[in-house]
Amino acid sequence: MKPKTLSPILTAKGVRLAIAVGRFNERVTKLLLEGALEAYARLGGDPAEVLVAWVPGSFELPLVAKRLAQRPDVDAVVALGAVIRGETPHFEYVAGQAASGLMQAMLQTEKPIVFGVLTTNTPEEAQERAGGKAGNKGAEAVFTAIEMVRLLEAISR
């Protein structure tokens, strides 16, 4: 006997997306945003309809992502940022708290809030993940957001 599997169609058409982007390491985060908007368009969405909110850095993403998710005209939020390791423990605090805060916001709002924050050792690694050889993690985050919206719709049917 075969189990019933929920297999939602991956289309952005009709999905109201918001993206919160950290301004810190802006050279990288702009590339993540570009990749995210391109992915949304590839999935059938209109990038002009995406709500984008710039925040000072990755530490501020959870609050803004939560507020965006609370809006009735938003189905999912993608949080984009870049935290690059330095010589102090600042990296661990920012990256860990951003991840934890975004998870809490997602569970509280019951809307997908996708972690698209790069955590790398060097600026070069960040560039690679923002459109270089390692792809664009902003695009991957949008694919995840759309899949989650469609999966939650399928579960609710």
UniProtKB/Swiss-Prot annotation:
Keywords carried by this UniProt record: Riboflavin biosynthesis, Transferase
Q: In which pathway does it act?
A: Cofactor biosynthesis; riboflavin biosynthesis; riboflavin from 2-hydroxy-3-oxobutyl phosphate and 5-amino-6-(D-ribitylamino)uracil: step 1/2
Q: What is its EC number?
A: 2.5.1.78
Q: Which reaction does it catalyse?
A: (2S)-2-hydroxy-3-oxobutyl phosphate + 5-amino-6-(D-ribitylamino)uracil = 6,7-dimethyl-8-(1-D-ribityl)lumazine + phosphate + 2 H2O + H(+)
Instruction: Identify one Pfam family in the record.
Output: DMRL_synthase
Q: List the disulfide bonds.
A: none
* InterPro entries for this protein: LS, LS/RS, LS/RS_sf
The protein's GO terms of the molecular function aspect are:
6,7-dimethyl-8-ribityllumazine synthase activity
First-level EC class: transferase
The active site lies at 90
Q: GO:BP terms for this protein?
A: riboflavin biosynthetic process
Q: Name one GO cellular component term.
A: riboflavin synthase complex
Q: Does the keyword Endoplasmic reticulum apply?
A: no
* UniProt binding sites for (2S)-2-hydroxy-3-oxobutyl phosphate: 87-88, 129
Which residues are listed for 5-amino-6-(D-ribitylamino)uracil binding in this entry?
24, 58-60, 82-84, 115
Record-stated family = Belongs to the DMRL synthase family.
Function field: Catalyzes the formation of 6,7-dimethyl-8-ribityllumazine by condensation of 5-amino-6-(D-ribitylamino)uracil with 3,4-dihydroxy-2-butanone 4-phosphate. This is the penultimate step in the biosynthesis of riboflavin.
Q: What is this protein called?
A: 6,7-dimethyl-8-ribityllumazine synthase
Gene source species: Thermus thermophilus (strain ATCC 27634 / DSM 579 / HB8)
Lineage, opening ranks: Bacteria, Thermotogati, Deinococcota, Deinococci, Thermales
